[in-house]
Amino acid sequence: MIIKVIPVGPIAVNCSVVADEKSGEAIIIDPGAEAEKILEAVKDFKVVGIVATHGHIDHVGQVGKLKELFDVPFYMNPLDKFLINDEIWSGFASYIGAVPCPEPDVEISEGDVIRVGDVEFKVLHTPGHTPGLCCLYEEKRRVLIAGDLLFKGSVGRWDLPGGNLVELKKSVKRVLTELPQDTLVICGHYDETTIGQERAFNPFAGELLNG
């Protein structure tokens, strides 16, 4: 498995390109901005799908352009369809260069599997930041693409459209307790981390794990 993490746009969304070395197939996850940078990252692969961890515009801002270029299915949880063309803040779509986002071709939910050659991502429905946020977990290689659920030393916001603090706490606790401590966590913004590091040092973890 090859993973390229490309920070895109003015708020540095982590777009991930995940490829299978044998087949040369790849998926694009959270293409929020700067389609040109993403195209450069996938130039040696055959793109077979586009996935959004959730529907906030900074994570889906280039889905429309890339779907048109590659003619591949777009995967997202349907609970976030109401968000995909919501600016959040006035002028934000223009600020990040977002284009209109289509509705998902494939509606993903808990327990689904997204395959890219030999790579298998299990879908974990982890609401709270948004109703439909889904993490993608590659069990064999212990990699979690967490979207905006969990960050290094922090957690996702719950005060944006679709946010729910009660659900967020449940979802963060779930990944911190169910996944192996050496799981690599690729966050929706900022640096990568591990489940073990967040269990030990994330200031939100103590309350969640001991409460």
UniProtKB/Swiss-Prot annotation:
Zn(2+) 1 binds at H54, H56, H129, D148. This is Uncharacterized protein aq_2135. Belongs to the metallo-beta-lactamase superfamily. Glyoxalase II family. Its EC number is 3.-.-.-. Zn(2+) 2 binds at D58, H59, D148, H189. One of its GO terms (molecular function) is metal ion binding. The keyword Metal-binding applies. The keyword Iron does not apply. CDD domains: metallo-hydrolase-like_MBL-fold. Pfam families: Lactamase_B (PF00753). Binds 2 Zn(2+) ions per subunit. Its cofactor is Zn(2+).
